[in-house]
Amino acid sequence: MAFIKLLRKTKDEPSRLAKAVRHLQVTLDDPHATYRPRDVLFGQVLLDLKQNVANVRVRLTFIGEVKSKYGTAHKRGGCFMEKSTVLYGDDGDLDTDEMEPTVNGLTKGVHKFPFSIRVPSGKKIHSSIKFERGSVSYHLMAVFESVVEPEGVSAKVRTKVNILVPIDVYRYSDVVVKTILLNSNAKSKSHKINSNDHNGHLNGDVTTLTTSDGSSEGTKKTISESQIINNLSQRQVLQKSKSEGSKSESIQASTGQINQLPETSSQVSYNAVLTNGMNRDADNQTVKIDVRLPHSGFVQGEYIPLTINVSHYREYYHPAGVIATLVRVCKVASGRKEDTKEIYRKDICQSISPLLIESNKLENTISTYLKVPNDIIASMTSLPEHFTFQYFVEVVINLSRKLEIYSHSQKPLSYILEKQKTKKPLTIPRDLKELNLPASVNENGAWEVPRPSLNNEKSNGGIDSSRNDFQSKFGSAFNKSTLFGLKNIDEIHVAEQTIIFDDMVDVERLKRMRNVAGLSIETIIGNKRSSPAIDLAKLEISKLSQGKVMKSNGTSKNTSSSGSIESNSIVRYRYISFEQDTQSSTDSYDEDITKMGNQLNEWLSPANAYEEYYPVPEYSANENVFASEDKQELEYKRLHELESDPPQF
């Protein structure tokens, strides 16, 4: 009987708790904020009970979920992160006997449980995203359950949390240059093959691949013409990828990760020969294409400047000779044993430039721009079992005479070029347009408007107010990191005019034409660009070592007896230390660090500065500032000081 009674109690416990809950809610102090790893979430769990309950527990769980959709019906996903804590009650289960003990309880009414939980960090944390084929989401789940029967959850609620994992693109700061050489089929003797076909069709193919170490490999195949076309379509152009300061070179097909051309594509009339730039023969009729990127990593909202150099063996012109496209490639995995993936390509933006090769130069350098949108998804390759996001800058060189170029909506080339010309101009801020103030980028990288002279001021609040308004509105948007060398409004206007974001040229269709070559460069799209840390101690050593030279030129600033330096001189010393070679000063760093003593500024470094630590300022507590106490506590003290009522008899 005792066992049946206990069983009846455990079965009725979840239903009884479910009826006792009137409302359960999780609220964050800042619900619309975007949190990063190691940030602290502050909030509270609100529980409204209809009646008294005993042996209960309130649990808070931080959950990370991923979902993906392969094909039309195959959906999969799961929880890749789950960290929980108990806000009320015991974490363990309760061992019950015949007489059920009471370990805790909550009375009828509203109960608030404040919490603070730190966002996890590491490789298992990913940014929150949502797109057509999947999502990564985070939630805070509050659960009200019984200690006696933990599986019987009476109430639970979720609230969404936005997580942004910083992707620093500073380590992708090397210059990227890719070069391809295109040899003419008709003039190149190395590609001529004797054929027994009476119709004059090409029955053989020889491809010479020269790598950076000077070795070459030649292959000869006797196959049909359709097989040659299929072979050439799959390896249209071989790319050479090199980065300044890097010793490794990678060789891949220009359409290796982006394009999967069909077998019926036309034959390109240029066979690609990858070369290291040293064995190019000037007598050969070749076309050389160089594409240069100043960085391989860019932040959302930045411009991507491209420098494209085309060397031709004869004069040539095409109104759409160079087409640069920022491409996003999403790969969705199936999760099956065969490891099949669906590839989705999306053109983000595009720039069309004319190609003009004059007879006297036989080469042309084109400078064009692409722009990374602010709301774009950052690069993600940390979830290959579900989906990945990669970005490429694809440059297509149109060497054909045909103007059969169409957009995705089947609009001709004339419509695309006319739309590019009639694009709305960039809105110039009022400070630059009406007041005609020259804007520039200062040494700190900020977009600023110089302060006008007092003679031009009409009133005390006229130009100053508009200048401050410009600084507050556009100072963070237009900075040196975003512009990448665009230091005036004219260059920004040109960059904006050449970029197309909708109804772009169908590059996949264009590359199926004859005499069209293309290459792609993988780029990293992030959301952060950190600057290198400046060692202030080395900066001061460099300044002290150059002090005699500056005094001899009469450019030194007078300092006070305490060693303080004006702010203008600090900026000048910093500029000089960047421009001049500081190798000699850094080599003697170990010797000079012990001789500095009191020569450094007191605000810049403590007296016992160590070599491995950056100098930090010292602060003392302000004894004149008192923190105000709680109003209820002050009211309690005030009432306590009053005289008490006389006792009543």
Curated annotation (Swiss-Prot):
GO cellular component: cytoplasmic side of plasma membrane; cytosol
A single BP term in Gene Ontology: ubiquitin-dependent endocytosis
Region (Disordered): 187-225, 239-262, 446-466
InterPro entries xref list: Arrestin-like_C, Arrestin-like_N, Arrestin_C-like, Arrestin_domain-protein, Ig_E-set
Spans traversing the lipid bilayer: none
Bias kind Polar residues: ranges: 205-217, 251-262, 453-466
One function term, GO molecular function aspect: ubiquitin protein ligase binding
A matching Pfam family: Arrestin_N
Function statement: Required for the proteolytic cleavage of the transcription factor RIM101 in response to alkaline ambient pH.
Family that this chain belongs to: Belongs to the arrestin family. PalF/RIM8 subfamily.
Protein name: pH-response regulator protein palF/RIM8
